[in-house]
Amino acid sequence: MEFSTSSFIFDDDTPPKCPLATKASFIFSVYIIIGLIISYLLQIFRIVRLGSSQGLSFSYLILGYIGVLNAFSNVIALQISPLTECCQNYYSKKQCFANTTGLIQVGSQVLIMGCVLMAFWMFLPRPIHFVAADDENGLPIPEPLSVTKSRKWRKASYGLLGVFTWGLFIICLSATVLSSNFAWAAFLGFSASFCAVVQYVPQIIKTIRHQSHGALSIPMMMMQTPGGFLIGYLLSRLPGTNWTTYMMYIVSACLQGLLLMLCMFYLHKEKSRRKREELQATLQEEESQRAVRILEAETGPE
């Protein structure tokens, strides 16, 4: 299928800072938004289905969310002013909407990743989520839940509160007093790229240590890895943006591909182990039945 490269409006008088979105880029942007939402819903559904977020690194999720928040604020800081000017003076309504899809992409990722964080927090494994109070002898009471929350639960709660506060703070700054501030945008872009690199380290370590992907959704990563490269390309075409805006997505896609291969390796290894165990159990059952038949043949009927 060939996509038309024609724009939504045909006006050669638009300045270079107001590029016209093509039909192809608009269609790809819509697909990316839908794909992002579906991919993160797959992660949420896996956590809910397992009833546990075991195997997911909290540092991985928090750093990833900070990176997305910073990238969203970077797009706001660089794009709001030129996009407003272009929409008021040069774009038609269709073209204005088409050129806001990049902002919608990153914004939808902020919202849905926040839902993933909440799902992680709600389904923390109970032995980690809560600790039991001590009885009169100083021994822990074996109860699944307790009023006294665990240290890790408090850490996750404070972490969520802190990152949501940070997100609200930088988004407000980027949309108001620091709009079109290139130094601020560069800081956000570099920090987003840094988080994109560092976030995968704790998850890779946790995956190798457990030798399992746990609650981490492989279908989510299979959708997001190629999508990350496409998002980076589409963001590079937006008015007012530069390489600090899309670099995070390129780096994230590369490292997520590495994590995906690691998870698929351990999944294949686990399936092979289960097949060997099932085969061994079948052989043992057949051997037991054969031994019973031999014993019955030797002893004969009573």
UniProtKB/Swiss-Prot annotation:
The keyword Transmembrane helix applies. InterPro entries: LAAT-1, PQ-loop_rpt. Keywords: Membrane, Transmembrane, Transmembrane helix. It is found in: Membrane. It is a multi-pass membrane protein. Its main location: membrane. Pfam families: PQ-loop. Coiled coil: none annotated. GO terms for cellular component: membrane. Gene3D superfamilies: 1.20.1280.290. The chain crosses the membrane at residues 25-45, 58-78, 104-124, 158-178, 182-202, 215-235, 247-267. Residues 175-245 form the PQ-loop domain. Signal peptide: none annotated. This is Uncharacterized protein C4C5.03.
